[in-house]
C-alpha cells in the first residue's frame, strides 16, 4: 500500500511539473525556399558584474542560439552599442570579450589560437554543436571613442576570427543571393563635422548591386532634425533600400517608411535591456518593451520573392517567441501580421 501511495504521489508530482512547464517554442525549420537568413540584435554589451555576463544578455544570447539551431542563419549582425558605457578599453579587453562576446555568443564565435588559449573556458557549448557565422558589427553611440573603435576593429579579431567591424563610416557587403548590405556609422554621420562623408552613403547605395538592399546602422530614422542629412543622402542615391536594420532604442519595433526612404525599419535594440523610450517612430506599426532579437529571411525567387521580417521577444517569464512579423516585396510593399506580445 505504501509503495502504491509513493508511486501515485510521484506520478501526480510529475504531472504537476509537466503542466507548470511552459510550452516549447515552435518555429518552422529553414526550408529550401529561404535563400538567406540574417539574425540581428543591438545594445547588448552591458558592463559585466564581477566578471559575469548580465542575465538579460545571456537570456537573449541563449534564445538566439536556439533559433539558429532550429533554422540555421547565414550571419549575425550587431547593430551597435557593443560595449557599454564608453566602448572597449585596452585595460579590460579580455574580460569584456569573455563576458560580453565569447561567453554569451559561444554558439556563433570562431576563436583564434589566441582566443582559445585565453578565453576558451568561457565558451561552454561543445565545439561540435557550434555554428560559427560571420559576425558583422557597426558602432553605436557608446562605442565611438578612438580607443574603442581601434580595439573593435583590430584587437577583437585577434581573439574572434569571424568578428568584423564595418561601416567606418560607410561600407558595402555584397552577398551572392542578390542582397547588398550597406553598413554606416550613424553616430558619425549625425555630426556636422562629418558632413563631407555623407556622399559616401549616397554613392554606396547608388552603386549597390541589389536588387535587395539592406541598410545597417545603429540609429533608426526617428524624425529628428539630426536625421535629415542622412535622409537626404539616401534620397540622392536614386535607388531605395527595402530595409533599415537598427537598434539604439532598447526595445523591439517595426515601422513602414515612405519613398525614397527605406521601405521598412526593423529595430532590434533589446540585446541586453528593455529601457524603451516609448516614443513613436514615423510610420510605426509595432512596439514592444522587451529584450529580444530580429530575424530577416530572403524567401523565394522571381516575382514572389520577399523579405520576411520577424521580432522575437525574450523574457524571464516566458519562452522566446515571435511577436511580430512582416513581409517586404522587392518594390517595397509591406504586409504586416502581429502575432502577440510578451512582458519583460
Identify the residue ranges that each predicted region occupies:
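A short C-terminal boundary segment appended to hydrolase-like catalytic domains
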Residues: 285-344
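Short acidic, glycine-rich surface-loop motifs adjacent to enzyme active sites
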Residues: 208-224
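Alpha/beta-hydrolase fold active-site loops
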Residues: 36, 74, 178-179, 212-214
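N-terminal active-site segment of His-dependent metallophosphoesterases
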Residues: 19-96, 195, 218, 224
